[in-house]
Curated annotation (Swiss-Prot):
Cytoplasm as UniProt keyword: yes
Keyword Kinase found: yes
Its EC number(s): 2.7.1.24
Keywords: ATP-binding, Coenzyme A biosynthesis, Cytoplasm, Kinase, Nucleotide-binding, Transferase
Gene Ontology CC, one term: cytoplasm
Signal sequence bounds: none
Reaction it catalyzes: 3'-dephospho-CoA + ATP = ADP + CoA + H(+)
Subcellular location field: Cytoplasm
Name under which the protein is recorded: Dephospho-CoA kinase
Predominant location category: cytoplasm
Provenance organism: Corynebacterium glutamicum (strain ATCC 13032 / DSM 20300 / JCM 1318 / BCRC 11384 / CCUG 27702 / LMG 3730 / NBRC 12168 / NCIMB 10025 / NRRL B-2784 / 534)
Similarity remark: Belongs to the CoaE family.
A Pfam entry, by short name: CoaE
Pathway(s) where this gene product acts: Cofactor biosynthesis; coenzyme A biosynthesis; CoA from (R)-pantothenate: step 5/5
Amino acid sequence: MLRIGLTGGIGSGKSTVADLLSSEGFLIVDADQVARDIVEPGQPALAELAEAFGQDILKPDGTLDRAGLAAKAFVSEEQTALLNAITHPRIAEESARRFNEAEDQGAKVAVYDMPLLVEKGLDRKMDLVVVVDVDVEERVRRLVEKRGLTEDDVRRRIASQVPDDVRLKAADIVVDNNGTLEDLHAEASKLIAEILSRVN
Protein backbone atom coordinates (compact mmCIF):
# COMPACT_ATOMS: atom_id res chain seq x y z
CA MET A 1 0.00 0.00 0.00
CA LEU A 2 1.29 3.43 -0.97
CA ARG A 3 1.31 5.74 2.07
CA ILE A 4 1.03 9.39 1.11
CA GLY A 5 1.57 12.28 3.50
CA LEU A 6 -0.43 15.36 2.52
CA THR A 7 0.48 18.61 4.21
CA GLY A 8 0.59 22.38 3.82
CA GLY A 9 0.50 25.48 5.96
CA ILE A 10 -2.70 26.99 7.29
CA GLY A 11 -4.71 28.43 4.41
CA SER A 12 -2.85 26.42 1.76
CA GLY A 13 -5.92 24.56 0.49
CA LYS A 14 -4.71 21.19 1.77
CA SER A 15 -8.23 20.18 2.84
CA THR A 16 -9.57 20.94 -0.65
CA VAL A 17 -6.90 18.68 -2.16
CA ALA A 18 -7.78 15.97 0.40
CA ASP A 19 -11.45 16.25 -0.62
CA LEU A 20 -10.51 15.93 -4.31
CA LEU A 21 -8.42 12.82 -3.58
CA SER A 22 -11.26 11.37 -1.50
CA SER A 23 -13.72 11.93 -4.34
CA GLU A 24 -11.40 9.82 -6.55
CA GLY A 25 -11.77 6.95 -4.07
CA PHE A 26 -8.52 7.31 -2.14
CA LEU A 27 -8.78 6.55 1.56
CA ILE A 28 -8.04 9.63 3.69
CA VAL A 29 -6.84 9.44 7.29
CA ASP A 30 -7.57 12.96 8.57
CA ALA A 31 -5.34 13.77 11.58
CA ASP A 32 -7.70 16.54 12.74
CA GLN A 33 -10.64 14.11 12.71
CA VAL A 34 -8.58 11.51 14.59
CA ALA A 35 -7.74 14.19 17.19
CA ARG A 36 -11.48 14.79 17.67
CA ASP A 37 -12.31 11.07 17.80
CA ILE A 38 -9.79 10.23 20.54
CA VAL A 39 -11.42 12.67 22.99
CA GLU A 40 -14.96 11.32 22.57
CA PRO A 41 -16.73 10.18 25.77
CA GLY A 42 -15.45 6.76 26.86
CA GLN A 43 -12.02 7.27 25.30
CA PRO A 44 -9.03 7.01 27.70
CA ALA A 45 -7.58 10.35 26.51
CA LEU A 46 -10.70 12.23 27.65
CA ALA A 47 -10.45 10.80 31.18
CA GLU A 48 -6.74 11.66 31.28
CA LEU A 49 -7.41 15.23 30.13
CA ALA A 50 -10.08 15.69 32.81
CA GLU A 51 -7.66 14.38 35.43
CA ALA A 52 -4.86 16.66 34.23
CA PHE A 53 -6.83 19.86 33.59
CA GLY A 54 -9.87 19.47 35.87
CA GLN A 55 -13.38 18.04 35.53
CA ASP A 56 -14.68 21.46 34.44
CA ILE A 57 -13.27 20.85 30.94
CA LEU A 58 -16.22 18.47 30.52
CA LYS A 59 -19.68 19.66 29.51
CA PRO A 60 -22.71 18.43 31.50
CA ASP A 61 -23.28 15.71 28.86
CA GLY A 62 -19.72 14.39 29.38
CA THR A 63 -18.29 15.68 26.10
CA LEU A 64 -15.16 17.82 25.92
CA ASP A 65 -15.54 21.58 26.25
CA ARG A 66 -12.87 22.48 23.67
CA ALA A 67 -12.82 26.17 24.53
CA GLY A 68 -12.51 25.32 28.22
CA LEU A 69 -9.60 22.98 27.54
CA ALA A 70 -7.89 25.53 25.27
CA ALA A 71 -8.19 28.21 27.96
CA LYS A 72 -6.23 25.98 30.34
CA ALA A 73 -3.89 24.17 27.95
CA PHE A 74 -2.47 27.17 26.11
CA VAL A 75 -1.62 29.39 29.10
CA SER A 76 1.97 28.10 29.30
CA GLU A 77 4.41 25.90 27.42
CA GLU A 78 4.24 23.37 30.28
CA GLN A 79 0.45 23.07 30.03
CA THR A 80 0.62 22.76 26.23
CA ALA A 81 3.29 20.06 26.60
CA LEU A 82 1.00 18.21 29.01
CA LEU A 83 -1.88 18.36 26.50
CA ASN A 84 0.42 17.10 23.73
CA ALA A 85 1.82 14.31 25.93
CA ILE A 86 -1.72 12.99 26.46
CA THR A 87 -3.11 13.44 22.94
CA HIS A 88 -0.24 13.06 20.45
CA PRO A 89 0.66 9.40 21.19
CA ARG A 90 -3.04 8.49 20.94
CA ILE A 91 -3.40 10.35 17.62
CA ALA A 92 -0.34 8.51 16.26
CA GLU A 93 -1.62 5.15 17.51
CA GLU A 94 -5.15 5.60 16.11
CA SER A 95 -3.82 6.93 12.78
CA ALA A 96 -1.53 3.89 12.47
CA ARG A 97 -4.48 1.61 13.29
CA ARG A 98 -6.53 3.19 10.48
CA PHE A 99 -3.65 2.78 8.01
CA ASN A 100 -3.23 -0.88 8.98
CA GLU A 101 -6.97 -1.48 8.69
CA ALA A 102 -6.93 0.06 5.20
CA GLU A 103 -4.05 -2.18 4.17
CA ASP A 104 -5.81 -5.26 5.58
CA GLN A 105 -8.87 -4.36 3.51
CA GLY A 106 -6.76 -4.23 0.36
CA ALA A 107 -6.46 -0.47 -0.15
CA LYS A 108 -3.77 0.38 -2.70
CA VAL A 109 -3.36 3.97 -1.44
CA ALA A 110 -3.93 5.74 1.88
CA VAL A 111 -3.45 9.47 2.35
CA TYR A 112 -2.49 10.98 5.72
CA ASP A 113 -3.94 14.50 5.81
CA MET A 114 -1.71 15.99 8.51
CA PRO A 115 -0.98 19.71 9.11
CA LEU A 116 2.10 18.98 11.26
CA LEU A 117 3.50 16.12 9.13
CA VAL A 118 6.95 17.71 8.80
CA GLU A 119 7.03 19.20 12.31
CA LYS A 120 6.41 15.73 13.78
CA GLY A 121 8.95 14.01 11.51
CA LEU A 122 6.19 11.83 10.03
CA ASP A 123 7.18 12.76 6.48
CA ARG A 124 9.99 10.19 6.85
CA LYS A 125 7.43 7.41 7.43
CA MET A 126 5.59 8.11 4.16
CA ASP A 127 6.27 6.66 0.72
CA LEU A 128 5.34 9.96 -0.90
CA VAL A 129 5.06 13.48 0.58
CA VAL A 130 2.74 15.98 -1.10
CA VAL A 131 2.93 19.63 -0.06
CA VAL A 132 0.22 22.11 -1.05
CA ASP A 133 2.01 25.44 -1.44
CA VAL A 134 0.73 29.02 -1.52
CA ASP A 135 2.63 32.28 -1.06
CA VAL A 136 2.32 33.59 2.50
CA GLU A 137 0.67 36.88 1.48
CA GLU A 138 -1.95 35.01 -0.54
CA ARG A 139 -2.66 32.70 2.41
CA VAL A 140 -3.08 35.72 4.70
CA ARG A 141 -5.49 37.34 2.23
CA ARG A 142 -7.58 34.17 1.84
CA LEU A 143 -7.79 33.45 5.58
CA VAL A 144 -8.80 37.01 6.45
CA GLU A 145 -11.44 36.98 3.68
CA LYS A 146 -12.81 33.45 4.04
CA ARG A 147 -12.45 32.63 7.74
CA GLY A 148 -12.92 36.10 9.15
CA LEU A 149 -9.65 35.96 11.09
CA THR A 150 -7.62 39.09 11.83
CA GLU A 151 -4.39 39.57 9.91
CA ASP A 152 -2.38 39.49 13.17
CA ASP A 153 -3.99 36.20 14.19
CA VAL A 154 -3.28 34.66 10.77
CA ARG A 155 0.36 35.76 10.83
CA ARG A 156 0.79 34.36 14.35
CA ARG A 157 -0.63 31.00 13.26
CA ILE A 158 1.60 30.90 10.19
CA ALA A 159 4.64 31.78 12.34
CA SER A 160 3.83 28.91 14.72
CA GLN A 161 4.18 26.39 11.88
CA VAL A 162 7.37 25.20 10.22
CA PRO A 163 8.61 27.68 7.54
CA ASP A 164 7.45 26.97 3.98
CA ASP A 165 10.99 26.28 2.72
CA VAL A 166 11.44 23.51 5.31
CA ARG A 167 8.12 21.94 4.31
CA LEU A 168 9.01 22.20 0.61
CA LYS A 169 12.36 20.44 1.18
CA ALA A 170 10.42 17.43 2.49
CA ALA A 171 8.14 17.34 -0.58
CA ASP A 172 8.27 14.71 -3.29
CA ILE A 173 5.45 16.51 -5.11
CA VAL A 174 4.43 20.17 -4.75
CA VAL A 175 0.85 21.18 -5.57
CA ASP A 176 0.85 24.90 -6.46
CA ASN A 177 -2.32 26.59 -5.20
CA ASN A 178 -1.51 30.23 -5.99
CA GLY A 179 -4.08 30.30 -8.80
CA THR A 180 -7.83 29.80 -9.09
CA LEU A 181 -9.91 26.85 -7.87
CA GLU A 182 -9.93 25.60 -11.49
CA ASP A 183 -6.12 25.70 -11.47
CA LEU A 184 -6.10 23.69 -8.24
CA HIS A 185 -8.41 21.07 -9.79
CA ALA A 186 -5.96 20.77 -12.70
CA GLU A 187 -3.03 20.40 -10.27
CA ALA A 188 -4.98 17.75 -8.33
CA SER A 189 -5.68 15.84 -11.56
CA LYS A 190 -1.93 15.74 -12.27
CA LEU A 191 -1.32 14.54 -8.71
CA ILE A 192 -3.94 11.79 -9.06
CA ALA A 193 -2.36 10.63 -12.34
CA GLU A 194 1.06 10.53 -10.65
CA ILE A 195 -0.30 8.50 -7.71
CA LEU A 196 -2.05 6.03 -10.02
CA SER A 197 1.13 5.61 -12.09
CA ARG A 198 2.92 4.50 -8.91
CA VAL A 199 0.37 1.88 -7.89
CA ASN A 200 -0.57 0.43 -11.29
